UniProtKB/Swiss-Prot annotation:
Keywords: Cytoplasm, NADP, Oxidoreductase, Queuosine biosynthesis. Substrate binds at I86, E87, S88, H226, E227. Catalyzes the NADPH-dependent reduction of 7-cyano-7-deazaguanine (preQ0) to 7-aminomethyl-7-deazaguanine (preQ1). Pathway: tRNA modification; tRNA-queuosine biosynthesis. NADPH binds at S88, K89, R255, G256. GO terms for cellular component: cytoplasm. This is NADPH-dependent 7-cyano-7-deazaguanine reductase. Pfam families: QueF, QueF_N. The lineage of its organism: Bacteria, Pseudomonadati, Pseudomonadota, Gammaproteobacteria, Pasteurellales. Signal peptide: none annotated.
């Protein structure tokens, strides 16, 4: 995979940057989804028909018209059909630029963010800005399904290898939800670790859980963005397991006040945003 594209070379990610305190929409940086989809052969037609990159933004603050600081938490849904994904460090810098800028009210901030993200992503984006009090009653959730992590197996390789999924199914037709907390990959630019919980919901021939776990662990030294990893997992499962229906959903731990939770499916609606124990 060759990601040495001009759109990546210009990213602020991995570079020393200054933090702006006045609103600046030009801080947002796009990454074309085609960079990864070309290699997967899905640039024109994706095997998933429903999906979004679901972001939670915890560090949002601005000034009201009297200069009093305000804070909020945002849920952001970035449609999978957008031309670009949003590079996470640029998003953090963009959010920080609100800190010393005055806005009339919550709605003005929400509309500003939604407009700017739509322009950067070149696709549909939904932003919901919530007062902190909304989260007072929020529970720590868990993703329903059988956890595949407690298997007594020996692992000797941590290099990505989709071939772990070869011959991974039996003839038994099932509907299953499987969960692994062992998803770990590395940032494409900085090599920093990205920690996630993976949820797979499928209908089709039963998937061998040992083969699936070995495949998940093989991402451990793999360098890709969160969104790209989830699309790769979806494509690999469709290729090797050939399920009738499939959802792949990953919830990653927070970095820089942001968590990214890509969801791709060919049969399920988008989930409500939630929070897992590690988030």
């Amino acid at each position: 995979m060759n990601y040495q594209d001009n759109s990546l070379k210009s990213l602020k990610l991995g570079q020393k940057t200054e933090y702006a305190s006045q609103y600046d929409r030009t801080l947002l940086q796009p990454v074309p989804r085609a960079l990864n989809r070309d290699g997967l052969g899905i640039t024109q037609n994706q095997p998933f028909t429903i999906g979004a990159d679901i972001w939670t933004a915890y560090e949002i603050s601005w000034l009201n018209e009297k200069g009093l600081p305000q804070v909020a938490i945002a849920d952001i849904y970035l449609d999978y059909q957008s031309q670009n994904l949003i590079e996470s460090k640029s998003f953090k810098l963009y959010l920080n630029s609100f800190n010393q800028s005055k806005f009339a009210d919550f709605n003005a901030v929400q509309q500003t963010m939604q407009r700017d993200l739509i322009e950067c992503a070149q696709g549909d984006v939904k932003v919901r800005l919530n007062p902190v009090a909304v989260y007072d009653a929020q529970k720590i959730e868990h993703l329903q399904g059988d956890c595949i992590d407690e298997q007594d197996i020996e692992i000797t390789s941590y290099e990505f290898n989709a071939d772990w999924l070869k011959d991974c199914v039996s003839d038994e037709i099932v509907e299953e939800k499987l969960v692994s907390h062992l998803l770990k990959s590395n940032c494409l630019i900085t090599n920093q670790p990205d920690w996630g919980t993976l949820h797979i919901h499928y209908v089709g021939k039963k998937i061998n859980q040992e083969k699936l776990l070995r495949y998940v662990v093989s991402f451990r030294q793999h360098n890709e963005f969160h969104e790209q990893c989830v699309e790769r997992i979806f494509c690999d499962l469709m290729h090797y397991a050939k399920p009738e229906k499939l959802t792949v959903y990953a919830r990653y731990t927070r970095r820089g006040g942001l968590d990214i939770n890509p969801f791709r499916s060919n049969f399920e609606n988008l989930p409500e945003n939630l929070r897992l124990a590690r988030q």
